[in-house]
Structure formats: structure tokens, C-alpha cells
Amino acid sequence: MLSASCSGLVILLIFRRTSGDSVTQTEGPVTLPERAALTLNCTYQSSYSTFLFWYVQYLNKEPELLLKSSENQETDSRGFQASPIKSDSSFHLEKPSVQLSDSAVYYCALR
């Protein structure tokens, strides 16, 4: 359990690859002070149409879908947002102000 007095946010990142396609994301862990802006980079290579996803896994929990790609920028109820940018094959995850409760493992995935 994380202490309420903890001044940093730790985010762990893991790489995922699929056959013939690839995803590269920010290497972790990333440590930020509370209320700092967060950007987790995700770039991909694919020969086919792509569906992009961000998953989050909190301590002792199963991974859950955070965001999926769409034509427009998508924002979830926790304040995370991501927009697919086809010109540079990216789907970066952003949050303007992180909280201690955002400490988790984040996965960028491609289907």
C-alpha cells in the first residue's frame, strides 16, 4: 500500500509486440511529483489498419481498458487523454495533472 505522504508518482511501463507489428512506448519506471503533467509516448508500426489501446493495471488488480483509438481525441473519466496521430504513427497518453492514485503499470497495445 502506498503512503499518503509519498510525494512521487511511479508509473511502470511494459513493451508489447504482435506478429509483424510493433509498439514502442516510454520506458519505465517514470516518477513524477503530484500535479505534474504526464505524457507517455507510444509509437507503432503496422502493415494493416490499426486499433490502438491504452490499458492500466493497478497494484494487485487485473489490467483494464483505459482508452481506445478513435477519430477524435478521447478523454476518460480519470482525466487521461490520447489522440491517434497517423502522420507519425503515435498514440501518446497524456494527463495534465497526475495524482498518487494514478500509480500503476500502463500498457500501449496494438491490434
Swiss-Prot record:
Disulfide bonds join C42-C108. GO terms for cellular component: T cell receptor complex. Residues 1-20 form the signal peptide. Glycans are attached at N41. The keyword Glycoprotein applies. It is found in: Cell membrane. PROSITE patterns: IG_LIKE (PS50835). Coiled coil: none annotated. It comes from the Eukaryota. The keyword Protein transport does not apply. Residues 21-111 form the Ig-like domain. GO terms for biological process: adaptive immune response. Keywords: Adaptive immunity, Cell membrane, Disulfide bond, Glycoprotein, Immunity, Immunoglobulin domain, Membrane, Receptor, Signal, T cell receptor. Alpha-beta TR is a heterodimer composed of an alpha and beta chain; disulfide-linked. The alpha-beta TR is associated with the transmembrane signaling CD3 coreceptor proteins to form the TR-CD3 (TcR or TCR). The assembly of alpha-beta TR heterodimers with CD3 occurs in the endoplasmic reticulum where a single alpha-beta TR heterodimer associates with one CD3D-CD3E heterodimer, one CD3G-CD3E heterodimer and one CD247 homodimer forming a stable octameric structure. CD3D-CD3E and CD3G-CD3E heterodimers preferentially associate with TR alpha and TR beta chains, respectively. V region of the variable domain of T cell receptor (TR) alpha chain that participates in the antigen recognition. Alpha-beta T cell receptors are antigen specific receptors which are essential to the immune response and are present on the cell surface of T lymphocytes. Recognize peptide-major histocompatibility (MH) (pMH) complexes that are displayed by antigen presenting cells (APC), a prerequisite for efficient T cell adaptive immunity against pathogens. This is T cell receptor alpha variable 18. It comes from Homo sapiens (Human).
